[in-house]
């Protein structure tokens, strides 16, 4: 996989944006291409990778967003595909996302598909809570995607001395490839509003965003070995 990405980025290196916040978005795909109809696993698949020059995810800077807590629709349920980067997961989220957007909310906070009371993900991102100086995020136990950005943030947080505990809510933020780290300022459930902090981006969220994007854009040293240099071969 890494070799394939290096080859493609080497070919498309001139498309890599150089402005702050911009990036060359890389997305791998695997899809079935058997000929015929029927419900069965495919025997043949196509693996491909696309690159897309992308502007800053936050056009006006990184600012907290308002989140709608969804307790009717579900994104995933035990035994299904919630733990994978599966296209069907996105399809299941469209209706709830549209309804939230109509009410002025940026994303949907997904609850578990059984009891609908445990937090799982926000939009298409993993979500994290800062509670009494500690950080909590949903476990990846079958319905939550073990995101790479999530894993990177957890590793950095542990390096900074944070651990998990229940307590008073201090910060909420989502983690994902495109947005990297997305702060949350408000949660709404059944007409009740929960305001996070003072409505501004919290210090841990800001530090995570600055560190992650700083390493991605070469502004600070990559101390984790996450950046792969691509040599010009073409």
Model-derived features with residue positions:
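Extended, compositionally biased flexible segments
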Residues: 1-18, 23-35
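Helix-start/capping segments and mature chain N-termini
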Residues: 3-4, 8, 29, 36-234
């Amino acid at each position: 996989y890494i070799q394939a990405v290096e080859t493609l980025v080497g070919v498309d290196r001139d498309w890599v944006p150089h402005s702050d916040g911009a990036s060359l978005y890389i997305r791998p795909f695997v899809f079935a291409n058997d000929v015929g109809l029927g419900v069965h696993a495919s025997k043949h698949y196509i693996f491909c990778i696309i690159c897309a020059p992308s502007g800053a995810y936050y056009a006006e800077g990184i600012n907290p967003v308002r989140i709608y807590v969804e307790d009717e629709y579900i994104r995933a349920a035990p035994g299904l595909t919630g733990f994978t980067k599966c296209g069907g997961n996105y399809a299941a989220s469209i209706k709830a996302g549209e309804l939230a957007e109509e009410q002025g909310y940026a994303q949907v906070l997904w609850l578990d598909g059984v009891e609908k009371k445990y937090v799982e993900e926000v939009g298409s991102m993993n979500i994290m809570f800062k509670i009494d100086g500690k950080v909590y995020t949903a476990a990846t136990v079958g319905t939550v995607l073990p995101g790479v950005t999530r894993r990177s943030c957890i590793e950095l947080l542990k390096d900074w001395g944070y651990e998990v505990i229940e307590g008073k809510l201090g910060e909420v933020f989502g983690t994902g490839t495109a947005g990297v780290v997305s702060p949350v300022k408000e949660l709404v459930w059944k007409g009740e509003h929960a305001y996070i902090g003072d409505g501004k981006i919290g210090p841990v969220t800001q530090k995570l965003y600055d560190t992650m994007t700083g390493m991605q854009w070469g502004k600070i040293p990559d101390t984790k070995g996450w950046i792969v240099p691509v040599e010009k071969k073409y």
